[in-house]
Amino acid sequence: MLPGLFPLALRLARKHAIGAIRISHEESRLRAVLSSGGELNTSVLLKQGIQARGLKLLARDAREMAERAGISSTDYFCGIAQTGVLTREGVERLLETLPEGTTELMCHPGYVDEDLRQTRTRLQGSRQTELEILTDTSVRKIVATRGIRLINYGFLAQAA
């Protein structure tokens, strides 16, 4: 989020009792781990990786600002560089190497329906793929074996 907008987002979150907010501060190590496997589209990953680095720079003070405002966030965030090109292998590797704490994997799983077909998003085909990745037996097995707890932002707000 742009630095000038983040204080406004925090004020609105407090005003409307929203206890947690996304901070798009993507760690390079997590981005690298998630980029593994499959047939990678290197030009897309390069472009989106540059965007992720830019967002990381813009978000460098966001965590401290959110803490001062009493708004929770995840400890780690990843997935921007892989938007639309997420792979099962990358998700598996990420799950196997998660750091201690909470990590948001930003993705867009879903079904392609008539409403989605009417939009001008390049993420139409990848939604079904990401849904299949996240519900894949091998991915679910890693989650269970490693004791990974799947949560949402509501949990973050309650845990604070």
Residue ranges of predicted features:
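Active-site pocket-lining segments that scaffold enzyme catalytic pockets across diverse folds
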Residues: 1
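Terminal accessory/targeting
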Residues: 7-160
